[in-house]
Swiss-Prot record:
Protein's name according to its UniProt entry: Probable GMP synthase [glutamine-hydrolyzing]
Organism the protein comes from: Leptospira interrogans serogroup Icterohaemorrhagiae serovar Lai (strain 56601)
Cross-referenced PANTHER family: GMP SYNTHASE [GLUTAMINE-HYDROLYZING] (PTHR11922:SF2), GMP SYNTHASE-RELATED (PTHR11922)
Catalytic activity: XMP + L-glutamine + ATP + H2O = GMP + L-glutamate + AMP + diphosphate + 2 H(+)
Active-site residues, record numbering mapped to chain: C81, H170, E172
Pfam families linked to this entry: GATase, GMP_synt_C, NAD_synthase
EC annotation from Swiss-Prot or TrEMBL: 6.3.5.2
Quaternary context: Homodimer.
Keywords tagged on the record: ATP-binding, Glutamine amidotransferase, GMP biosynthesis, Ligase, Nucleotide-binding, Purine biosynthesis
Enzyme class, first EC level, given as a word: ligase
GO annotation, biological process: GMP biosynthetic process
Pathway, per record: Purine metabolism; GMP biosynthesis; GMP from XMP (L-Gln route): step 1/1
Entry's Gene Ontology cellular component terms: cytosol
């Protein structure tokens, strides 16, 4: 399908480039991703250009840039975060390191009466999502300030005559109130007609699969039972016919309680017939004494390939005629450093070196790799899956192994004193640094830092959100904040690192806790109100062999940003009572961290 009116998104390697494209598509305009090194003739083909965010600083040597000739094309241009700063620098403005940085929610304030078409239907006070360590301190000639935030003097700027705009916040994420309104305003400025929808993606993707996969080739599809792999499997079956796609499920020993049997029943109902292999002993053996999150993910990814190879041999399949199918979605690739300028936040199990080599050899097919979770769900419904099915909580491909933390990381006395000093101004709140670390993301870069636990004086959620956001923004050694529900005095508790083995005993413990939590939220009718709720096992207790559980309920749409779910106290209390009935569980924590700075999963 030839589309003459479209918007280019120039990728500078941030987490958000493809998300921008996705959001524009959902607003009914077609988008394509371009590199920042395209010839000027390529940029000239578009009705509008968006310069994405990125993990670099525009003043760093060799940081990615773009030709200044794009500003002479007469095409509307929107810069977002890094893209905004790059426009300012290239046209004569000044960008410097910010004094504090800005991560998470901020309030957008309009500047005087400088109304502008890019902010049509904005009234001021809208929440926007920030994720930056640099800021613009001087505008180029011809630009004016349109809006600002508490910590950002130039949150929105414009050169109205040239239709060039810059915004410091991320309008493309769901947590920016009216973000879609701003993007739709830009679409209107570009004069782009509504030419895109998920139904068109389906038609184009089926055609692409049929043209890409040779007639003699078949697909070996790794199905976890999650939404992504299931939708991928159905899409491949629709494009190629079910006889050319083999669904294969590996029981790793790190699946949820009764998952394999449940999945077989549910997928059979959808006419999906799986071959199941129990490889739990191999996974337990290979992960013994392992703790580093990157190493764990890479081991899991390689074990999946080993299991696949054995299955190919045992099933007497012609290896050369088979492609590996994966349910990879875009956040998996971008968090694994999947674009030229991106930083690795975490290596996903389907992006380990062995699989990367297969991808380079053309032996992997990933039919939904450019989609986000919300789009995958829409596609699933279009393919005939029930809404209840596609609405299930996301579950990581490696399973519970990424929800079992094993790395000890003690905070320093100096760090604790800094935390104490800040919290002393917060009306009775106190905190302790837990001796563990988790993966997070700050300014599009991976962070691996400590977690702080706060006491509970039944402070309202908004105040806890503010304090948690401030802690993770202000202190570089913190990227996650949790609450110890219904416990006002932390001094009486001794949070010791007790160690963790990725074995059947610990996975059974987490399986039981996970099942307990899900049972409560389903009983109370909350399951569909929470986007995802990882239940995490921590090696924290007072005695040897004791562990702790973290509740991580979040609200999100696309997994690129998220905020913690404000749970009713009565619900939290019921969950705590039920979970602490499990003998080995000593503490129950509640995660107060937004994304950024913390990833949804702890590893």
């Amino acid at each position: 399908m030839v589309i003459h009116k479209k918007i280019a998104v120039v990728d500078f390697g941030g987490q958000y480039a493809h998300l921008i494209a996705s959001r524009i598509r959902r607003l009914g305009a077609y988008t394509e991703i371009l590199s920042n090194e395209e010839p000027i003739s390529n940029y000239q083909k578009y009705s509008g250009i968006i310069l994405s965010g990125g993990p670099e600083s525009v003043y760093e040597p060799n940081s990615p840039t773009v030709t200044t000739r794009i500003f002479d094309l007469g095409i509307p241009i929107l810069g977002i975060c890094y893209g905004h700063q790059l426009i300012m620098k290239l046209l004569g403005g000044v960008v410097e390191r910010s004094g504090t940085g800005e991560y998470g929610p901020a309030s957008l304030q309009l500047h005087g009466t400088n109304g502008n078409s890019i902010l049509k239907n904005f009234v001021g006070g809208e929440q926007v999502w920030m994720n930056h360590a640099d800021e613009v301190v001087k505008l180029p000639e011809g630009f004016s300030k349109i809006a600002f935030s508490k910590d950002c003097g130039y949150a929105v700027v414009a050169n109205s005559s040239k239709k060039i705009f810059g915004i410091q916040f991320h309008a493309e994420v769901s947590h920016s109130e009216k973000g879609s309104v701003l993007l739709d305003n830009f679409i209107q400025i570009c004069g782009v007609s509504k030419t895109w929808g998920i139904d068109q993606f389906l038609k184009e993707k089926i055609k692409e699969i049929q043209e890409t996969v040779k007639q003699e080739q078949k697909i070996f599809m790794l199905v976890s039972g999650g939404v992504d792999s299931t939708v991928s499997y159905l899409l491949l079956c629709k494009a190629l016919g079910a006889e050319r796609v083999l669904g294969f499920l590996i029981d790793t020993g790190f699946m949820r309680k009764d998952e394999v049997v449940s999945l077989q029943k549910k997928l059979t109902f959808q006419n999906i017939h799986l071959t199941v292999r129990d490889e739990s002993s191999l996974f337990y053996k290979s992960l013994k004494d392992k703790s580093d999150p990157e190493e764990k993910r890479k081991i899991v990814g390689n074990l999946f390939l080993e299991a696949r190879d054995r299955a190919v041999k045992d099933l007497d399949l012609e290896y050369g005629d088979w492609l590996l199918g994966q349910g990879t979605i875009y956040p998996d690739t971008i968090e694994s450093g999947g674009t030229k300028h991106s930083h690795t936040i975490k290596t996903h199990h389907n992006r380990v070196e062995a699989i990367q080599k297969l991808i380079e050899q053309g032996k992997v097919i990933e039919p939904i790799r450019d989609l986000y979770k919300d789009e995958v769900r829409d596609l699933g419904v279009l393919l005939g899956l029930e809404s209840e099915w596609v609405g299930r909580h996301p579950f990581p491909g490696p399973g519970l192994v990424v929800r079992m933390l094993a790395v000890e990381k003690k905070g320093t006395d100096k760090d604790q004193l800094e935390i104490d000093s800040y919290l002393s101004t917060q009306d009775g709140l106190s905190g302790k640094i837990l001796p563990i670390a988790s993966v997070g993301v700050k300014g599009d870069r991976r962070s691996y830092a400590n977690c702080v636990v706060l006491n509970d004086i039944e402070t309202d959620w908004n105040t806890l959100d503010r304090v948690a956001t401030h802690l993770s923004n202000r202190f570089s050694f913190i990227n996650r904040v949790v609450l110890l529900p219904f416990e006002s005095d932390l001094k009486k508790w001794n949070f010791q690192f007790t160690g963790m083995q990725l074995d059947k005993k610990c996975s059974d413990l987490l399986r039981e806790a996970d099942f307990t939590v899900e049972s409560v939220i389903r009983k109370l009718g909350l399951y569909n109100k929470i986007w995802q709720m990882p239940v995490v096992l921590l090696p924290i207790g007072e005695k040897e062999n004791e562990k702790s559980i973290v509740l991580r309920p979040v609200e999100s749409q696309e997994a690129m940003t998220a905020n913690f779910f404000r749970m009713e106290r009565s619900v939290l209390q019921e969950i705590k009572i039920e979970v602490l009935k499990i003998p080995e569980i000593r503490y129950l924590f509640f995660d107060l961290t937004n994304k950024p700075p913390g990833t949804i999963e702890w590893e």
